[in-house]
């Protein structure tokens, strides 16, 4: 079994949300099989930035990326999160 790398775009509730704190909250609430490989910020508009997370997770996860989106969407300070890319790691 191999892993996949999921690119997740996380939109904060407002421009007042601290993205570093949001990143910490997300990383603490992810299942133990998930690992954040990299994080970036992306300007959206009017001072609002999105958090871009590169998450490694098992390929054979039941429900695919739905579980990842659900966990992140239920965190305080998150407006919504969406998968913008996915690729298989290894062969």
Swiss-Prot record:
SUPFAM superfamilies the record matches: eEF-1beta-like (SSF54984)
Keywords: Elongation factor, Protein biosynthesis
SMART domains assigned: EF1_GNE
Segments traversing the membrane: none
GO molecular function terms attached to this record: translation elongation factor activity
Keyword hit for Nucleotide-binding: no
CDD domains: EF1B (cd00292)
Pfam families found in the cross-reference section: EF1_GNE
UniProt cross-references to InterPro entries, sorted A to Z: eEF-1beta-like_sf (IPR036219), EF1B_bsu/dsu_GNE (IPR014038), Transl_elong_EF1B/ribsomal_bS6 (IPR014717), Transl_elong_EF1B_B_arc (IPR004542)
PANTHER family tied to this protein: ELONGATION FACTOR 1-BETA
Family: Belongs to the EF-1-beta/EF-1-delta family.
Function: Promotes the exchange of GDP for GTP in EF-1-alpha/GDP, thus allowing the regeneration of EF-1-alpha/GTP that could then be used to form the ternary complex EF-1-alpha/GTP/AAtRNA.
The protein, known as: Elongation factor 1-beta
Taxonomic lineage from the root: Archaea, Thermoproteota, Thermoprotei, Sulfolobales, Sulfolobaceae
Record gene name: ef1b
């Amino acid at each position: 079994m191999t892993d996949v790398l999921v690119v997740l775009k996380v939109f904060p509730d407002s421009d007042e949300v601290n993205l570093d704190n949001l990143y910490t909250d997300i990383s603490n609430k992810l299942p133990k099989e998930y690992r954040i490989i990299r994080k970036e910020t992306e300007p959206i508009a009017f001072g609002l930035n999105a958090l871009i997370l590169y998450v490694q997770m098992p390929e054979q996860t039941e429900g695919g990326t739905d579980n990842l989106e659900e966990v992140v969407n239920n965190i305080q300070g998150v407006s919504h999160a969406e998968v913008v890319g996915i690729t298989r790691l290894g062969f």
